């Protein structure tokens, strides 16, 4: 295992073991690594916007995919799509950033299934970027701050409509 992948693996393991999310512990580490890489390709850090790592897109996705209210079809598409992607492109994690981006762009041009998979990951990445931090993304309101968003009031005190 390359040093870089080892670091990613240990980071993802820390995410899993620091939570009480049962489904996350059932997601293979390679699936998490691929999802993390794809999110970082879709949401790169720019001079004005945070990248997927900064707004914690993977943590948001894992936290929310594990909740009972998460759409089952979306969960299936994300997890099975990632499994299929790994099966078709097992070398993905060994590619450099440019090659990874080119591969993602190529598959969404040639496969409706891949396009819907990437689209769904993008959808939840946008949610992670702009949702209230209580849901696990938008770490320290980083995305809100990057667009000078005025925070809505009242902010949620608990997640998913739980009673206070």
Regions from the language model: what does each represent?
Residues 22-55:
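Immediate post-signal-peptide N-terminus of mature secreted/exported proteins
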Residues 37, 49, 56-164:
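Mature-region segments of soluble proteins
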Residues 11, 39-43, 66:
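Short amphipathic alpha-helical segments enriched in leucine
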Residues 4-24:
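N-terminal export signals
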């Amino acid at each position: 295992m390359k040093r870089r992948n080892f670091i990613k693996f240990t980071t993802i393991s820390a995410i899993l073991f620091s939570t009480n999310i049962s489904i996350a512990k059932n997601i293979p580490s390679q699936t998490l690594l691929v999802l993390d890489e794809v999110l970082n390709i879709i949401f790169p850090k720019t001079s004005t916007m945070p990248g997927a790592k900064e707004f914690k897109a993977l943590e948001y996705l894992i936290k929310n995919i594990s909740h009972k209210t998460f759409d089952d079809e979306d969960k299936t598409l994300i997890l099975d799509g990632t499994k299929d992607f790994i099966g078709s492109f097992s070398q993905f994690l060994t590619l450099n950033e440019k090659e990874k981006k080119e591969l993602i762009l190529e598959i969404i041009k040639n496969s409706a299934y891949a396009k819907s998979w990437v689209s769904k990951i993008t959808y939840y990445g946008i949610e992670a970027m702009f949702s209230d931090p209580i849901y696990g993304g938008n770490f320290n309101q980083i995305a809100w701050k990057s667009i000078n968003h005025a925070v809505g009031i009242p902010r949620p005190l608990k997640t998913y409509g739980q009673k206070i």
